[in-house]
Regions:
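Short alpha-helical donor nucleotide-sugar binding micro-motif in glycosyltransferases
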Residues: 210-211, 218-223
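A short, histidine- and acid-enriched strand-loop-helix "catalytic/donor-clamping" loop
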Residues: 72-89, 102-105
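Conserved donor-binding/catalytic core segment of Leloir-type glycosyltransferases
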Residues: 147-168, 174-177
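Conserved acidic donor-binding segment of nucleotide-sugar-dependent glycosyltransferases
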Residues: 263-264, 268-275, 283-289
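Short hydrophobic beta-strand element within catalytic cores of glycosyltransferases
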Residues: 248-251
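Aromatic "clamp/platform" in nucleotide-sugar-dependent glycosyltransferases that forms part
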Residues: 231
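Nucleotide-activated donor-binding/catalytic signature segment of Leloir-type glycosyltransferases, i.e.
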Residues: 196-211
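Donor nucleotide-sugar binding/catalytic pocket of nucleotide-sugar-dependent glycosyltransferases
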Residues: 97-145, 207
């Protein structure tokens, strides 16, 4: 059996998924021009073609399916918030109503979204957007000396990780943190057009800029609470990254990664329009943190394990 997966380019949060797909015989191809797809299919005669979302690639594959005899499976990042009307655009909303009818399968990151698709279209596989703990956990342990070296304070660290843009709703976090500034250190990891405004709002916060590789991993060992306050967020892979490192999370209900949160266990959910709700969540989680925490490898707080999920997904796909 021959399978081809197409994506527009390397996607860091899909790194482990694509690696295991490749090991399972699904060839991953990046940035193939739409005009070259049919010639590839003519030459290689795949049995299954994996496409991103409801993209032009998906439409090309569906139009060509009868000619080449392959099945079409989409990787879709829809969240329940998007399904309920908070979409990034009308084109995706329209495509969601039509294209799933014609797909042979669709891979979704949320159990609730999967149920929604199954109830309306009779199809849907589940695979959360998480990394492989067998790869990441040893790396977190390896960078512990760097974590200890760059630790800025003994106080608990509350952090945001991502782009400084409007949809991330960072000003709400800064205002919500204000009553807690004597109890914790706020760290903003990232950059973007809103940085000058944010720096003027929070002179007490630590701004690191974008971080990559070991330095980014080292900070995850230090973060006690990660906050994702977005008003619109298809997923938010940083939630899973933080939980895998043992940090607790405060996540907007409008983020797709809210599905990873188990309230009372690994985090707290809030309405991103309710700044007091953010403060309340932070206060609640601060009370649960041990005092004088050593910088050490912590328990993985993710509710799912990559190996279990990917093996279940491959079994379901192979039944098509």
């Amino acid at each position: 059996m021959s399978d081809l997966l197409y994506t527009n380019g390397p996607v860091p949060y899909r790194e482990d998924l694509f690696r295991v797909f490749h090991e399972a015989g699904i060839e991953v191809r990046f940035g193939v021009p739409a005009g070259d797809l049919r010639s590839e299919w003519e030459r290689e005669r795949p049995d299954r073609v994996f496409v991103p979302e409801f993209s032009a690639m998906a439409l090309t594959a569906l139009r060509s399916r009868k000619r080449f005899g392959f099945k079409v499976i989409s990787l879709c990042d829809d969240s329940m918030d998007m399904i309920c009307g908070n979409d990034f655009g009308w084109k995706h909303r329209l495509a969601r109503r039509v294209i799933p009818h014609y797909l042979d399968g669709i891979i979704l990151h949320s159990p609730d979204v999967r149920l929604w698709y199954q109830s309306r279209f009779g199809k849907g596989f589940f695979m959360p957007i998480i990394a492989d703990e067998r790869r990441v956990r040893p790396e977190l342990e390896r960078v512990l000396p760097l974590s200890r070296q760059i630790r800025p304070t003994e106080k608990p660290i509350i952090a945001f990780v991502g782009r400084f843009v409007g949809l991330k709703n960072i000003p709400a976090l800064l205002r919500a943190f204000e009553p807690l500034r004597n109890r914790a250190q706020l760290v903003l990891i990232g950059d973007g057009p809103e940085r000058p405004v944010l720096e003027s709002m929070a002179p007490h916060a630590l701004f690191t800029g974008f971080l990559f590789g070991d330095e980014r991993l080292a900070w995850y060992n230090l973060i006690d609470i990660l906050v994702l306050p977005s008003t619109q967020e298809a997923y938010g892979a940083v939630t899973g990254e933080a939980l895998m490192a043992g940090a607790k999370v405060v996540v907007s209900r409008q983020a797709g990664s809210s599905d990873l949160v188990r309230e009372g266990e690994n985090g707290c959910l809030f309405d991103p329009m309710d700044e007091k709700g953010i403060t309340d969540c932070l206060e609640k989680l601060l009370e649960t943190l041990p005092s004088g925490r050593p910088v050490a490898l912590r328990e993985n707080l993710l509710p799912y394990r990559f190996e279990t999920c990917i093996q279940d997904l491959l079994k379901e796909i192979n039944l098509l």
